[in-house]
Swiss-Prot record:
It is found in: Cytoplasm. This is Geranylgeranylglyceryl phosphate synthase. It comes from Methanococcus maripaludis (strain C5 / ATCC BAA-1333). Its main location: cytoplasm. GO terms for molecular function: imidazoleglycerol-phosphate synthase activity; magnesium ion binding; phosphoglycerol geranylgeranyltransferase activity.
Length: 256
């Protein structure tokens, strides 16, 4: 049996292969200025991910509107089973692998599976890993995360390898929205090397210079959210750094 990869995932893979890295902007549907954010990022992001850790109101309406404003692929990043809408293009079908609560490991995605099938949403199978300092953020609290210490990059690497053996094609190394500091470079590199699958990095990435470092270390996708909410115009410089790093990384890899 051949594994089928959907249109959105294929498009994202092509961006990563040709440009070295992709840029996702996370929009919380509960943010009052989501329209403003969508307008600012539409020319710079490769995709929009929609989600929040605490409650969601009017998800159908907000998702449809963001899709119309941006014209970009809209991917759901559900914080719970209610974070799914037929208005999206795809969903990050994920397991919060290092949660202390099996609800977030397996029960929540299982409960949402039939709804996803009913809506005909494309799924991107993904391991979601909570990295220090995620315990100080909303997702760390709600998801009861047994955070991976930054000083133990090999733990994230082994989780990522495990995810690849489970058949997942994406790993999200998450420091948490508004995190004091991002996932370190060594952890990104080890996770990429061991798993060989797409590595998404988010949380605490506030400057183009930091984004550049993360891509050069092995990140395939950079996610910004809080930064975008505070300064929507910052995405232009962020995109430049991510794409430059992507091309520099491709050149570096071609010489090996």
């Amino acid at each position: 049996m051949q594994i089928k990869i959907g249109e959105i995932e294929s498009k994202l893979n092509n961006i990563i292969e040709e440009e070295g890295a992709a840029y996702f902007v996370l929009i919380d549907p509960d943010e009052k200025n989501y329209r403003e954010i969508a307008n600012h990022v539409k020319d710079y992001a490769d995709a929009i991910i929609i989600g929040g850790s605490i409650g969601i109101i009017n998800l159908d309406e907000v998702t449809k509107e963001i899709k119309e404003i941006t014209g970009l692929p809209v991917i759901l990043f559900p914080g719970n089973v209610d974070g799914v809408t037929k208005e999206a293009d795809a969903v990050l079908f994920m397991s919060l692998m290092n949660s202390k609560n099996t609800y977030w490991n397996m029960t929540a995605p299982t409960l949402g599976a039939l709804t996803i099938k009913k809506y005909g949403l494309e799924t991107l199978p993904m391991a979601y890993l909570g990295i220090e300092p995620i315990s100080k953020t909303a997702v760390g609290f709600v998801g009861e995360v047994n955070e991976i210490p930054q000083k133990k990059p090999e733990i994230a690497g082994i989780y990522s390898l495990s995810a690849s053996y489970f058949g997942m094609r994406w790993v999200y190394l998450e420091a948490g929205s508004g995190a004091e500091y991002p996932v370190n470079n060594e952890m990104i590199g080890v996770s990429k090397k061991l798993s060989g699958i797409n590595i998404i990095v988010g949380g605490g990435i506030r400057t183009p210079e930091v984004a550049y470092e993360k891509v050069m270390s092995g990140a395939d996708v950079i996610v910004t959210g809080t930064l975008t909410e505070k300064d929507p115009k910052a995405v232009e410089e962020m995109k430049k750094a991510i794409k430059k790093a992507g091309m520099d990384k491709l050149k570096m890899l071609s010489k090996k």
